Amino acid sequence: LPWMLRYQVPIWPERSLTRHDGAELERLVRNRSSAAWQAGEDFAETIGRLRRAIQIPSAAHSALEYQRWAARSQLRGEGRRFMRSMKRPMSVPVLHLRGDGDPYVLADPVNRTRQYAPHGRYASIAGAGHYAHEEAPGQVNDQLTRFLEQVYARPVS
């Protein structure tokens, strides 16, 4: 959690993400993704695009807002209302995908959320880290297809 606290400081985190053409962004992605994806050509292309995108004015600020809101909102009324609403089980079907090598979203907390999504489908993406949709798009698409076929009770093409 120290990184979450560092993101609360104004301006510095944005500068950190954009400095040296987005080198910090690349470091974060590498720390949260699988070695197999990093070794591929797709990773080099993707990381190049991400490093360019983080340089767009306000992109770094927007990328950090989720972490800022998650920390700060706990002290405000909106955060308390959000947390109350999240304690109720959801009645809609949910697909929760997680890379089995994700060091950021851990398996145990994910498994504890099952009580809130009784109609949920939880799937682990083998060999993927935090960016499963980028690292293993075929597996993710297969899971999405199966989920949609289950929800709509018919084949999805």
Locations of regions flagged by a protein language model:
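Catalytic histidine-centered segment of alpha/beta-hydrolase-like enzymes
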Residues: 128-141
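C-terminal amphipathic helix plus adjacent low-complexity
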Residues: 154-157
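Flexible "cap/lid" subdomain of the alpha/beta-hydrolase fold that forms the substrate-access gate
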Residues: 1-124, 145, 150-152
